[in-house]
């Protein structure tokens, strides 16, 4: 999970707002594609892990929170936006991971489209 977080932070450097959020989302999926079986392990660790795994997961949430807050959206809705974003990223990864192994470019593109659509709604509602 640490490596995944580092990769997500790296792709966000120098990017802003929607672009950074989309790149981080795709990098999350990329990591799962490149490391079969890790997604399931991460989910188990988040649910049953230690204080250390909780800290690592919270670093992931902190990155997304920072990116959300950089978007000049309603600050009072940050947690609500974070929940929508993580729900989309995790849900999409869960449902599409099997397809991603055989058609990774298609799945990456479709995740980017899903995130774009979500962000359009978020920016319309919470700006």
Which residues are covered by each model-predicted region?
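Solvent-exposed, amphipathic alpha-helical segments
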Residues: 3-11, 88-95
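Short amphipathic alpha-helical/adjacent loop interface patches that line ligand
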Residues: 1, 25, 36, 61, ...
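Amphipathic C-terminal alpha-helical segment
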Residues: 38-44, 87-104, 119-127
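Hydrophobic alpha-helical connector segments
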Residues: 6-37, 75, 82-85
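Amphipathic alpha-helical packing segments from all-alpha helical-bundle domains
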Residues: 5, 47-73, 79-83, 109-120
């Amino acid at each position: 999970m640490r490596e995944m977080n580092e990769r997500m932070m790296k792709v966000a450097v120098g990017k802003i707002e929607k672009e950074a959020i989309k790149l981080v989302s795709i990098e999350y999926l990329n990591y799962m594609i490149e490391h079969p079986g890790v997604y399931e392990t991460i989910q188990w660790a988040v649910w049953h892990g230690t204080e250390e795994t909780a800290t690592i997961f919270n670093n992931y949430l902190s990155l997304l929170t920072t990116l959300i807050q950089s978007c000049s959206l309603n600050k009072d809705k940050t947690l609500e936006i974070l929940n929508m974003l993580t729900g989309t990223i995790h849900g999409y990864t869960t449902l599409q991971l099997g397809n991603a192994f055989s058609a990774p470019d298609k799945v990456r593109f479709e995740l980017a489209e899903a995130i774009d659509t979500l962000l359009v709604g978020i920016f319309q509602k919470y700006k």
